[in-house]
Structures are given as C-alpha cells and as structure tokens.
C-alpha cells in the first residue's frame, strides 16, 4: 500500500510540472498562453495559476544579448482570483545563455508589437496601484517603474553572469480590449 501511495505522489508531482507546449506551440498557464515564437529565446516550462501564492512561472533560456519578445494571449475567459479581471502575478526565470554578463534587465509591455504601451491602453505593471512588494529580483537590488510614455520595469544594481539564472517577479494588469500583447525582455550588457 505504501508503494502505491509513493507512486501516486510521484505521478501527482509530475502532473504539476509543465509537460511542454500544446499542439499550437503555446504554453498554457492560468488564463493565458505564452509563446517564444518571435525568437531569440526558448521557453523550458510554464506553471502556475497567476495568483500571488501561485504565480505563473516561466522558465526560459535567453540566447541573445538583444531584446526578445514573449507573446502573451488570453487563453480562456478571465477568472476571478481575488484581483481585477485580467491581472496576474508573473515570475520569469531566465538563463543567461548570451555569453555576456548583464548589468541591468528591463521589461516593457506592448499592446501593439513594436509600439510601447502607454498610460491609457489598460496594460501595465499595475500602474493604478503600484505595490513595490510585488516586484522582486534575486540578482538586482533595485527597480524603477515607468508608466509614461511607456510601461517599463528596469532592474538595476546587480549583475548576472553567463549561465546564471536570475528570477524576476511582478504583477501585470491587462484590461485591454485585445487578446494578445507582448512582453519585451531586454538584458543590458556593459559596453566600453
């Protein structure tokens, strides 16, 4: 009987690990899907529901020192998780496979690909009620959030060596009328 319980526990633990992308190439978690289809990085796993205690966690490998773009799509009708519709906690764990050290890291939201999100489009890093307790990094000591003319979150005062895996946590609010938006990830490298 104990052996059966151990096997059941192991199977349950495996079911909590993201098994891979769906047939459409997207990774599903919470009310959204996530895609590395624009290149420069690849997703290893996506888990979580998007709540504060169970954030959506994206494990990825960044192969470039140039900005890369994560495609985020509403995957199903928005559920209520104790915060406004279209809001979720996100944790991004990124392996630095660029071959260069990073001295800062920036995230930018875009409702239209290539055009920074503005104050009025309904997409933000929680601009209506910013809470610094919801923003974190294990490699950078401080962050700056900018809501005008764009929605950017820059992490600074730290560094990430090649093959290191920094983690970033933040809250995204999405009350846009569109079902697809973008998260640009921009590692900053030292220059001489």
Model-assigned labels for residue ranges:
Residues 3, 18-21:
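N-terminal leader/targeting segments
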Residues 92-94:
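Buried hydrophobic-core signal for structured, non-transmembrane domains
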Residues 1-8:
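Bacterial N-terminal signal peptides that target proteins for export
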Residues 8-15:
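Bacterial N-terminal signal peptides
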Residues 20-89, 99-101, 106, 110-121, ...:
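Membrane engagement elements in two modes
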Residues 130-131:
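Long, charge-dense
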């Amino acid at each position: 009987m104990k052996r059966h319980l151990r096997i059941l526990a192991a199977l349950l633990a495996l079911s909590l690990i993201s098994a891979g992308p769906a047939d459409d190439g997207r990774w599903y978690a919470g009310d959204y899907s996530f895609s590395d289809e624009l290149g420069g990085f690849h997703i290893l796993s996506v888990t979580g529901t998007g709540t504060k205690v169970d954030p959506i966690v994206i494990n990825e490998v960044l192969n470039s020192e140039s900005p890369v773009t994560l495609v985020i799509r509403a995957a199903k009708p928005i559920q209520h998780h104790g915060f406004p519709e279209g809001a979720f906690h996100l944790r991004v764990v990124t392996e630095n496979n660029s071959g260069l050290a990073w001295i800062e890291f920036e995230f930018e939201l875009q409702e239209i690909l290539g055009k920074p999100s503005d104050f009025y489009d309904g997409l933000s890093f929680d601009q209506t009620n910013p809470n610094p307790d919801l923003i974190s990094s294990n490699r950078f000591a401080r962050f700056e959030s900018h809501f005008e003319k764009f929605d950017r979150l820059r992490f600074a005062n730290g560094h990430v060596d090649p093959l290191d895996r920094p983690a970033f946590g933040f809250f995204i609010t999405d009350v846009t009328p569109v079902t697809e938006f973008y998260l640009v990830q921009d590692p900053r490298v030292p220059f001489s």
